[in-house]
Amino acid sequence: MEEKLNDLKEQGIDWAFANGLIMIKKPTEEEAKNNVVNVTHVPFSLYPSKMNKKLFNEACKLAEDYNLLVHNISKDYDFLQNTLKDVFDDFTQMLLNIQRKVVKEGIKQKISLGIFRSDYMFHNKIEGEEERIYQVELNTISSSLAVVSNRVFNLHKYLIGRNDLNDNGYDLLNHPTNQSDKEISDSIALAHKLYNKEKSSVVLMIIQEGERNIYDQKGLEFQLWSNHSIKLIRRTMKEINQCAKLDEENGSVLIVDGMEISVAYYRAGYTPNDYTSSGGDEWKARLLIERSLAIKCPTIAHHLVGVKKIQQVLAQPGVLEKFINNDKESLQRVKRSFTGLYSLSKEDIDMSVVKEAIESPQNYVMKPQREGGGNNIYNDQVAIALKSMSSEELSSYILMDKIMSKSFKTHVVRDRQLLEIEGLYELGIYSVFISNGDDDIVLNKQAGILLRTKTANSDEVGVAAGFGLLDSPILE
């Protein structure tokens, strides 16, 4: 058995390097000083993980529901501003300020592109209780890993077929197709064609400095060119502030290094760490893009819908109905996906829930308003934070019931090492959405799958952040 697993490991590593399932390793100080770049495979499971088919399909069905929900909320300027005005978080307040400015000036571009990902965990706290899915979070900006997720699905198909594992419980008929890379690049291409002001325009990908997950991003760039003959350029926000301008005579066209931008696609800008210049260069770039005619992915409104406070407020009685008011089935599906979500803002904090969380912190998670992995508070730290933070500090978090999943044994490969772990997984469903103004919906569809597995004793699951690894499901 061990010999077979090692053989699978070597086959998997070779396939990963040959097919772009790779990322840049974090450099040592010496390597950084000498500009040495080392590449490794993205951590992956050796074979697919078993998953409840009914719940998988339920998660996929929710994709279009959440797309419409994000769209409807993004149209309600007053709801976003009023709901988030008391969030004690400078980052969120800066986003709100940009929205106020561009709405006052008048939105230049009616077309918007959304590339979203809704993440779910499978809840089964009590033995014998029916398993169900709960939403962990909804990502409305920089929904990454679509390219490498496609690769790990193909890796598993290769390993199963190559090693005759179909009879070992890994029937490829139960292994879903995942074209997340193509679906997302196609949506960017469609937005580019809708812009269609100048045939020589290009797509702008806004990136972080020192990006290690570059090959996931490059995969989209290559697909845009090979499938659609569309050029993509990459710039950091600091670079954009230096080299971008608006051509006011032509309706606020965004020009970067002399090139007209059709779509501004953010793979950065979701964390305060992306806005560090003392002169506010990155915030100036964000405002410039938002003021422009370029199609934004996301718009500032779409970004704000992803703030955790919105997730918490939607779970309150009567709120969701304002935004899903003509489809009872959709309303019930979305409601069913909500776990317990509680405000920590001083205006509406529920002290009985806070007291319970202090007494049983292992049953709760504190989540900050912003996106990006590694910022949540778990276990005993929840009680410490609730007791020590000021009311202003608490308002920058929400409290959430911890989703309890059953763990399973699996074999994984990280840094060329074969490991047996007790794992848990998180299922992400990509979706794409294009609207031309408030009421003209051009595209609304599910756009692929991301399955990330982590060790059962790990709280976070981010792959780029170093917590999780890529997986794929076998449905049963």
UniProtKB/Swiss-Prot annotation:
Keyword Cell membrane: no
Sequence positions that bind substrate: 117, 141-144, 211-213, 217, 267-270, 452, 463-464
Cofactor: Mg(2+)
Positions bound to ATP: 137, 308, 367-376, 378, 400-403, 426, 454, 460
Residues binding Mg(2+): 137, 139, 371
Biological process, per Gene Ontology: glutathione biosynthetic process
EC number per UniProt: 6.3.2.3
Pathway, per record: Sulfur metabolism; glutathione biosynthesis; glutathione from L-cysteine and L-glutamate: step 2/2
Recorded catalytic activity of this chain's protein: gamma-L-glutamyl-L-cysteine + glycine + ATP = glutathione + ADP + phosphate + H(+)
Organism domain of life: Eukaryota
Keyword line: ATP-binding, Glutathione biosynthesis, Ligase, Magnesium, Metal-binding, Nucleotide-binding
Annotated Pfam families: GSH_synth_ATP, GSH_synthase
GO molecular function, one term: glutathione binding
This protein's GO CC annotations: cytosol
Cofactor annotation remark: Binds 1 Mg(2+) ion per subunit.
Enzyme class label: ligase
Stated family: Belongs to the eukaryotic GSH synthase family.
NCBIfam families associated with the record: glut_syn_euk
UniProt subunit comment: Homodimer.
PANTHER family assigned: GLUTATHIONE SYNTHETASE
Protein name, as recorded: Glutathione synthetase
Species this protein is from: Dictyostelium discoideum (Social amoeba)
